[in-house]
Amino acid sequence: LVGSEMCIRDSFSTILLYVTIAFLLLWQLPWCYNFFVVKPEKTPFTLYSFVIGDFALMGQEEGKGTVRRDAAGNIYSEAAFDSILPMFYFRQLMSDERFPDTINGIAVTPKIVQTENFNFRSVPTDINAPSIGLYPLLESMSGRVDLKMPDDVFRITSKGIEFIDMASNSVNAEKSLQFTEAMAKKDFHFPAIEIVGNPTVKKEYDEGYLLLDADRRLFHLKQVKGRPYVRAIPLPEGLTLEHLYLTEFRNKKTLAFLTDVNNAFYVLRSRTYDIVKTGIPAFNPETDAVSYTHLRAHETRHDL
């Protein structure tokens, strides 16, 4: 009887082992197939050239090396490619003394290019990474050119905002009460479900943080001469925001980029706090990596 039980256990263990191996094979076979059979696709670097009115592409081609062409198939030398993308290669054109005075009849200068151009990048790892929930609030109007990191950090709880002195690890009750009352007066409902800023001194100016309160309403919070600045930002009818990106670009025309629960993309303008829906295709920040480059010498009504 004992021998029979041992045989049954051995048989069960063997069956379980084979089943486990089968599941592992089913799980790994698609990956192995893709690894050994599927060739990686090389997506060419692509920008729109308003000089030629078409897309310009640069990529590696087998036996040819780096090839620069437009969507119509015309091939360009490296210097010619620089010329049809003057807003992107303006440093090279300046070095070669080939930067144009006008583009499509519009006067341009290197200063305008540096001010108006920007890059925006969003990757899922930034969105999905866990947060420690402690944020430094810089002084936005210190009167000095260089920004300075504060001696404290803040967190937002269900009761309010707390400022914690990093040296003593103690709560600054007076400052916490001052900011909590300022936020409550603007009808901020604690806690915050989204807190977004750029806590670094390696930027030209500071706009503090954008917040979504417990009801997903949008607020702007910053510190101005030691006092709280809180602005409730009205949302268009039916808009429910999901993710926020504080921009702090050089031209100061844009305060933030926003996405809603349907992954549509919006611009929050500075000063007016107007929210404008863009024509950029929807993307899910939690799963999709995107990169946008704004290369315009002048502003139009449809610019970001």
Would you name each region that the model predicts?
Residues 274-304:
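Membrane-proximal extracellular "stem/stalk" segments
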